[in-house]
C-alpha cells in the first residue's frame, strides 16, 4: 500500500500528524512487563495495570486493548486492567516453538476524563519441563568401518525435546559403560544440537561385526526426563591395501597379573583396504617370539586379537616381547610386523607365608619329646615354605616348652615372606591366643615367640595360639596359621593326701592281715612325676620300742593299710602311723599323712574274782549261826580288764542248796542273808554257784562254788581279805562297785590295815622263796619240768593223767583241745562234765609256783573250752598260758632248736614271738636267725638229724603237715613201751612254706590282690620259720618216722562270731 493510501489524502496528512503528536503529547505512555509459567490454570492473575501504574481509578476509567487479541490466552478487565490467563491456557511450545524466549506483547489504552494513557504490556511465558526427549526412531542403525581409527565420529540422529533452556535436551549417552563407543552431544554456532558416536578403540569386524547398544537421552529438568533408543552399530570391512598396524611398528600394553585367561591385551587390527582374498589378513607370531610367550599369549590369526592364554605371574617375569606378523592372502602376499611389549603390573595376589621353627629344650636327647617336637616343627616349616599362601594354612605346628622355663624364654622362630612387591609384599605379623606368649621382632620378616609369664602345666597343659600375617596391599591378604605350644611336665608338685589325718577304728583281736584303711594321695604331675608310691615312716610304738612296720604294712601301689598282727586294746589303745607318699620324679617329692588307728575294745577278758580269793574254783564263807535276816555275810569283789559295758560286772547266786538262804547285790556283790539260820546246827553247809558276768555282747562269765558254813560264833560274817584288792589289780582293770560301805570304828580299821600289811609281806616272802626253789629245780633237772602230785587218798601215786604218768605211757594221753585249769581260774577241762555243772570237790595237787592251790587231774592246751563253743561264757583264745590275761600258769618245757628250756606259762610269750601278738617277722624281731642262709642251714641240720617226717608219698602228693611240724624227740633214755602219743601244745600249730596248693587258709577273707598285698599275705602266713613250740608234756625218745602223725587243728571263724574255736572231728591226720 502506498503512503498516500495508508494516511489518506495528501492534504489530510499534516492534520493527522498534528493530531497524533497532540495525542502523544497528551497521553502518558509506559511499558509494563509480566511473566507467567505455561500450563498455569485458567483465571490465574498475571498482574493489575492500575496498581502497577499507580493510577487512580474512578468510575469512568476503563482499560481496553488497542487491537484485537486472542482472549482465550489473556484477558483484560476494564475496571482496573487486571490481566488473567484465558480459558485455553498458555502453551509455550505452541506459542513460541523452539524459541529461547516466548513473549506475548500487546497495547492497552486507559480512558478517563482527565487523561488518556497507552500502556505497552509484555507477558513472558516461561517454560515448564512438560515434555520428555524423544528419538526420531526406536531403532537407529549405524555403520562404521573396521579400519576407522580411534576417535572417528559417526553422526547420529539427535533426539527432540520441545522444551527449551535447562528443560531441553542436555545429554545423550550409551547405557553400556564398557563399549568401544561414546556418544558426544554438541551445540553448533546456530544453536542447533548434534550427536556423534565416537570410536574409543579400534574395531575388528572379524571379531565383532556389530554392536547392539542403547542410547539414553536426558533433559535437565527437575526431575529430569529421558528417552531410550536401540543403536545398532555395524562394522564394515575395508581391506584394499597392504596390512598396516594402526599402532605402528611397536605397541606397548600393560596387563595386570591377576587378569583372567582370555582377557584382550591388544587388537592388532592390521588394516588392508583391499577386498576379498587380497584383504583377508592372517596374523601370526614372529620367529623371535619365545616359546613361553606363545603358551601365555594367544594371537587370533583372523582377527589379530592378542589375548591372554595362561596365568602370568609378576614375581616370575614382569615383561614379555611379542613379534606379530600380519599377512594378507592375495598373490604375492604382503606382510607387516609389529613388536608388542606386554608389561605385567603387580597386584596383591600372593598371601603372606608363615614358617615356624620350634626349638628343642637345651640338652634334650634325641629321643626326648622336645627333640621330636622340634623335628616335626622343622618338617612343617619346610612344607610351609614350599607352599603358596592360600589365606589360611591348616597345617599346625607344635612346640614343647618345659613348665619351669623362665620368662622371656625362646619357644620358636617365626619367619614371614610375601612374593609380591612394594606394599603388597610388606608383611606384619601378630600372635593371638593367650597372654602367656608374645611375639618379639628379631630381624626383617622374622619374629621370636617368647614366654611372657611363668608357665604351669597343671593349670594349662596346652596353648592353642594363632599366628596371623597380613600384607599392606589393597585389599590386604592375610594368612592364619594355628600354632600349639605344649607345656612339658616337671616334678614341681608333691603328692597331696586327700586329708592330713585319717582316723581308722579297728576292733582288737583282729586277724593278722586284716584291712584297715586306704590312704590316697594325688599328684597333678604326669608320667613318672605323677606316679605315687606309699611307704611307712618308721617310728617306735609306745614304750615297747617296736617298729611301726611290725604292726601294719602299706601297699606301695594302692595305699591300702593292713594289720600285721592282732591288736590288744588293753596294751595299745591307739597306733599312730605316718605314711609317706612319694612320686617318681627326679628329684623325688613326698608328703606325709597321719593315720590314727584306734583300737576298739572287745569283750575278750572274763571277770576275775579278786576277793575273797578262790581256792580251786571254790569259796568258803563262814556265817555266824546267830545271824539274822538281812545280815551282810560277805562282799564279793571282781575285776575285768575290759572297759565300758564290757567291764561292767553283774553278780548272781544260782543253784543254792539245800535251799535259798542268801542273795547277792547284782551290782554291789554284797551277799545278804535272806533267811534265819538260828536253827541250823554249826557246820551246816549251804552251797551256791557264784556267777560273775560282764556287760559285753556276748557276755563273758566266771563261776565259782561258794560254800556257806554255819559257825557257832557270832563274829563278823564278812571274811577278811588277804590283800587289798586295790593294790592287787593290774592297771586298767575295773573293780565292781562295793555298794554301800559298812560302818567301821577306828580300832577295827587299824587292825585291818595291819593285818593286810602283814599278809602282803608274807605273800612276798613266799613268792620269792617259791621262785628261787623253782629255778634250782630247773638247773638241777636240766630244764625238764616235773609236777609231783601226791594222791588224795594213798599218797605216793601220780594222779591219772599227770605229766609223769603220761611220759611213762601209763596214763591217758592228753587231749589237745582240753583246757588246763590253773589255780584260781575256776575253769573246767574241755569236754569234762564239770564244764556244764559246778565242779565237785577234788583232792588238791601241789603245783610248783602256786601256794595252797589245787589243779585238776588233767593237763591240756589252753584253747577254748566247751563253754566258749557254746557261746554263753565265751573267752578269748590264747596261744599260750596266760595269753588271755589269766593268772600265772605252771612252768612248761619249750623246744627251741635242738634243746629244751623250762619257762613259766607267762614267759612262754617271750620265746614264741610269732604267736605273742608282736606282729610280723620283721628285721631284728625274730626269735632266731631267719635269714636265707640260716633257714637253709637249719633245714639241712634237721634233715641230717633225721628230724623230717617225709615219706615216699611226699614225692608224688607233696609234703604234708607232719613233714613240717617240729620234732618232739628229745634226749630221754626211757623209750616208751608203746607208740608215742600225740603231743599237746600251748601254741597254734603252723606250717613252714610248702606247696601253694596245700597251703592252710587261715584268713581267706584277706586274700592278696596286688603285689603289695601278696607281700603282706606272705608276711602273715609265712613268718613261722623259727616258730617256737611250747610243750606241756616232756619229750620222749624215738625216731620221727616211728611217731604217729601230728594232729594239726584247723581254725575257721563261724558265721556271726569273731572268736576262733577248734573244729570238732578233725583231730585226724591232715
UniProtKB/Swiss-Prot annotation:
Keyword Repeat in record: yes
Residues the record marks as carrying a glycan: 616
Segments of this protein annotated with the region Disordered: 716-740, 777-859, 906-928, 1046-1070
Stretches of the chain found on the membrane's Extracellular side: 30-747
Transmembrane segments: 748-768
Listed InterPro entries: Cadherin-like_dom, Cadherin-like_sf, Cadherin_CS, Cadherin_N, Protocadherin/Cadherin-CA
SUPFAM superfamilies attached to this UniProt entry: Cadherin-like
Subcellular location: Cell membrane; Cell projection, Dendrite; Presynaptic cell membrane; Postsynaptic cell membrane
UniProt GO MF annotations: calcium ion binding
One BP annotation, GO: regulation of synaptic membrane adhesion
Residues found modified as Phosphoserine: 1053
Membrane topology according to the record: Single-pass type I membrane protein
Domain of life (superkingdom): Eukaryota
Residue ranges of every copy of the Cadherin domain listed in the record: 30-135, 136-245, 247-354, 393-497, 498-609, 615-721
Swiss-Prot/TrEMBL keywords: Calcium, Cell adhesion, Cell membrane, Cell projection, Glycoprotein, Membrane, Phosphoprotein, Postsynaptic cell membrane, Repeat, Signal, Synapse, Transmembrane, Transmembrane helix
Coiled-coil intervals, chain numbering: none
Biased composition annotated in UniProt, kind: Low complexity: 716-725
Pfam families registered for this protein in UniProt: Cadherin, Cadherin_2
Gene Ontology cellular-component terms listed: dendrite; glutamatergic synapse; plasma membrane; postsynaptic membrane; presynaptic membrane; Schaffer collateral - CA1 synapse
Protein task: Calcium-dependent cell-adhesion protein. May play a role in activity-induced synaptic reorganization underlying long term memory. Could be involved in CDH2 internalization through TAOK2/p38 MAPK pathway. In hippocampal neurons, may play a role in the down-regulation of dendritic spines, maybe through its action on CDH2 endocytosis.
Subunit structure and binding partners: The N-terminal extracellular domain forms homophilic interactions; these interactions activate p38 MAPK via TAOK2 and trigger endocytosis. Interacts with CDH2; this interaction may lead to CDH2 cointernalization. Interacts with CDH11. Interacts with TAOK2.
Protein name (Swiss-Prot/TrEMBL): Protocadherin-8
Amino acid at each position: 500500500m502506498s503512503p498516500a493510501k495508508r494516511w489518506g489524502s495528501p492534504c489530510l496528512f499534516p492534520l493527522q500528524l498534528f493530531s497524533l503528536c497532540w495525542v502523544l503529547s497528551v497521553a502518558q505512555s509506559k511499558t509494563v512487563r509480566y511473566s507467567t509459567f505455561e500450563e498455569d490454570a485458567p483465571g490465574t492473575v498475571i498482574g493489575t495495570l492500575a496498581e502497577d501504574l499507580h493510577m487512580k481509578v474512578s468510575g469512568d476509567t476503563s482499560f481496553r486493548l488497542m487491537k484485537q487479541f486472542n482472549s482465550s490466552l489473556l484477558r483484560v478487565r476494564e475496571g482496573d486492567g487486571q490481566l488473567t490467563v484465558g480459558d485455553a491456557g498458555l502453551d509455550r511450545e505452541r506459542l513460541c516453538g523452539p524459541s529461547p524466549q516466548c513473549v506475548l506483547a500487546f497495547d492497552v489504552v486507559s480512558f478517563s476524563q482527565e487523561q488518556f494513557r497507552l500502556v505497552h504490556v509484555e507477558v513472558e511465558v516461561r517454560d515448564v519441563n512438560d515434555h520428555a526427549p524423544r528419538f526420531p526412531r526406536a531403532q537407529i542403525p549405524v555403520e562404521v568401518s573396521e579400519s576407522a581409527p580411534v576417535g572417528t565420529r559417526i553422526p547420529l540422529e539427535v533426539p527432540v525435546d520441545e522444551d527449551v533452556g535447562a528443560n531441553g535436551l542436555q545429554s545423550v549417552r550409551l547405557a553400556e559403560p564398557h563399549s568401544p563407543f561414546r556418544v558426544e552431544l554438541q551445540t553448533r554456532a546456530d544453536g542447533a544440537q548434534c550427536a556423534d558416536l565416537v570410536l574409543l578403540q579400534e574395531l575388528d569386524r572379524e571379531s565383532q561385526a556389530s554392536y547392539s547398544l542403547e542410547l539414553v537421552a536426558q533433559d535437565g529438568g527437575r526431575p529430569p526426563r529421558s528417552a531410550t533408543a536401540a543403536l545398532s552399530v555395524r562394522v564394515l570391512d575395508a581391506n584394499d591395501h597392504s596390512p598396516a598396524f594402526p599402532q605402528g611398528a611397536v605397541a606397548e600394553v600393560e596387563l595386570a597379573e591377576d587378569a583372567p585367561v582370555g582377557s584382550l591385551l591388544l587388537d592388532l587390527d592390521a588394516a588392508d583396504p583391499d577386498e576379498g582374498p587380497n584383504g583377508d589378513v592372517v596374523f601370526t607370531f614372529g620367529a623371535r617370539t619365545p616359546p613361553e610367550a606363545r603358551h601365555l599369549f594367544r594371537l587370533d590369526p583372523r582377527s589379530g586379537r592378542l589375548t591372554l592364554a595362561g596365568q602370568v605371574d609378576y614375581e616370575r617375569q614382569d615383561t614379555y616381547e611379542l613379534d606379530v606378523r600380519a599377512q594378507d592372502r592375495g598373490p604375492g602376499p604382503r606382510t607387516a610386523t609389529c613388536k608388542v611389549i606386554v608389561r605385567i603390573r603387580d597386584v596383591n595376589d600372593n598371601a603372606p607365608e608363615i614358617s615356624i621353627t620350634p626349638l628343642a629344650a637345651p640338652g634334650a636327647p634325641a629321643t626326648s619329646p622336645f627333640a621330636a617336637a622340634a623335628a616335626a616343627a622343622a618338617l612343617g616349616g619346610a612344607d610351609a615354605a614350599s607352599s603358596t599362601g592360600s589365606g589360611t594354612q591348616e597345617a599346625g605346628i607344635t612346640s614343647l616348652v618345659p613348665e619351669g622355663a623362665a620368662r622371656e624364654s625362646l619357644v620358636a622362630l617365626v619367619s614371614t615372606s610375601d612374593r609380591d612387591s612394594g606394599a603388597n609384599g610388606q608383611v606384619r605379623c601378630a600372635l593371638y591366643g593367650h597372654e602367656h606368649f608374645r611375639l618379639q621382632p628379631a630381624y626383617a620378616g622374622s619374629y621370636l615367640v617368647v614366654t611372657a609369664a611363668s608357665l604351669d602345666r597343671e593349670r594349662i597343659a596346652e596353648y592353642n595360639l594363632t599366628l596371623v600375617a597380613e600384607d599392606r596391599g589393597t585389599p590386604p591378604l592375610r594368612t592364619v596359621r594355628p600354632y600349639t605350644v605344649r607345656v612339658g611336665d616337671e616334678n614341681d608338685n608333691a603328692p597331696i593326701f586327700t586329708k592330713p589325718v585319717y582316723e581308722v577304728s579297728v576292733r582288737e583281736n583282729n586277724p593278722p592281715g586284716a584291712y584297715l584303711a586306704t590312704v590316697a594321695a594325688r599328684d597333678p604331675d604326669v608320667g613318672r612325676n605323677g606316679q605315687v608310691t606309699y611307704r611307712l615312716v618308721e617310728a617306735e610304738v609306745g614304750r615297747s620300742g617296736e617298729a611301726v612296720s611290725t604292726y601294719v604294712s602299706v601297699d606301695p601301689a594302692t595305699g591300702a593299710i593292713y594289720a600285721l598282727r592282732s591288736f590288744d586294746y588293753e596294751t595299745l589303745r591307739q597306733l599312730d602311723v605316718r605314711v609317706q607318699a612319694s612320686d617318681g620324679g627326679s628329684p623325688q617329692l613326698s608328703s606325709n599323712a597321719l593315720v590314727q588307728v584306734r583300737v576298739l575294745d572287745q569283750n575278750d577278758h572274763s571277770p576275775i574274782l579278786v576277793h575273797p580269793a578262790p581256792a580251786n574254783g571254790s569259796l568258803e564263807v563262814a556265817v555266824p549261826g546267830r545271824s539274822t535276816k538281812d545280815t551282810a555275810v560277805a562282799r564279793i569283789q571282781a575285776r575285768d580288764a575290759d572297759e565300758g559295758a564290757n567291764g561292767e560286772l553283774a553278780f548272781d547266786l544260782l543253784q543254792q542248796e539245800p535251799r535259798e538262804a542268801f542273795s547277792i547285790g547284782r551290782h554291789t556283790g554284797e551277799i545278804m542273808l535272806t533267811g534265819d539260820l538260828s536253827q541250823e546246827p554249826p557246820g551246816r553247809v549251804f552251797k551256791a554257784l557264784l556267777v560273775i558276768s560282764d556287760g559285753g555282747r556276748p557276755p563273758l562269765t566266771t563261776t565259782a562254788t561258794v560254800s556257806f558254813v554255819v559257825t557257832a560264833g557270832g563274829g563278823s560274817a564278812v571274811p577278811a581279805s588277804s590283800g587289798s584288792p586295790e593294790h592287787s589289780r593290774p592297771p586298767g582293770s575295773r573293780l565292781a562297785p562295793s555298794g554301800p560301805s559298812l560302818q567301821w570304828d577306828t580300832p577295827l580299821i587299824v587292825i585291818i590295815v595291819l593285818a593286810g600289811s602283814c599278809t602282803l609281806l608274807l605273800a612276798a616272802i613266799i613268792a620269792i622263796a617259791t621262785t628261787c626253789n623253782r629255778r634250782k629245780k630247773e638247773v638241777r633237772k636240766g630244764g625238764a619240768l616235773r609236777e609231783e602230785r601226791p594222791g588224795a587218798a594213798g599218797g605216793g601215786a601220780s594222779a591219772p593223767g599227770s605229766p609223769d604218768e603220761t611220759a611213762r605211757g601209763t596214763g591217758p594221753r592228753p587231749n589237745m583241745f582240753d583246757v588246763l585249769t590253773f589255780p584260781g581260774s575256776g575253769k573246767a577241762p574241755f569236754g569234762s562234765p564239770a564244764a556244764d555243772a559246778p565242779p565237785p570237790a577234788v583232792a588238791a595237787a601241789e603245783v610248783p609256783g602256786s601256794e595252797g592251790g589245787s589243779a585238776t587231774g588233767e593237763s591240756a592246751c589252753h584253747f577254748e573250752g566247751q563253754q566258749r563253743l557254746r557261746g554263753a561264757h565265751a573267752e578269748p583264745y590264747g596261744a599260750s598260758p596266760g595269753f588271755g590275761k589269766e593268772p600265772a600258769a605252771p612252768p612248761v618245757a619249750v623246744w627251741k632248736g635242738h634243746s629244751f628250756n623250762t619257762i613259766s606259762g607267762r614267759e612262754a610269750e617271750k620265746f614264741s614271738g610269732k604267736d605273742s601278738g608282736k606282729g610280723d617277722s620283721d628285721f631284728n624281731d625274730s626269735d632266731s636267725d631267719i635269714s636265707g642262709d640260716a633257714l637253709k642251714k637249719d633245714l639241712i641240720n634237721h634233715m641230717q638229724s633225721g628230724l623230717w617226717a617225709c615219706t615216699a608219698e611226699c614225692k608224688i602228693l607233696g609234703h604234708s603237715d607232719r613233714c613240717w611240724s617240729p620234732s618232739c624227740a628229745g634226749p630221754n633214755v626211757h623209750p616208751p613201751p608203746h607208740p608215742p602219743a600225740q603231743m599237746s601244745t600251748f601254741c597254734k600249730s603252723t606250717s613252714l612254706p610248702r606247696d601253694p596248693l596245700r597251703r592252710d587258709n587261715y584268713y581267706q577273707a584277706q586274700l592278696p590282690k596286688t603285689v603289695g598285698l601278696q607281700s603282706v599275705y606272705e608276711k602273715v602266713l609265712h613268718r613261722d620259720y623259727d616258730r617256737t613250740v611250747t610243750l606241756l608234756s616232756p619229750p620222749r625218745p624215738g625216731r620221727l618216722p616211728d611217731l604217729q602223725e601230728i594232729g594239726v587243728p584247723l581254725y575257721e571263724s563261724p558265721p556271726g562270731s569273731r572268736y576262733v574255736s577248734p573244729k570238732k572231728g578233725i583231730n585226724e591226720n591232715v
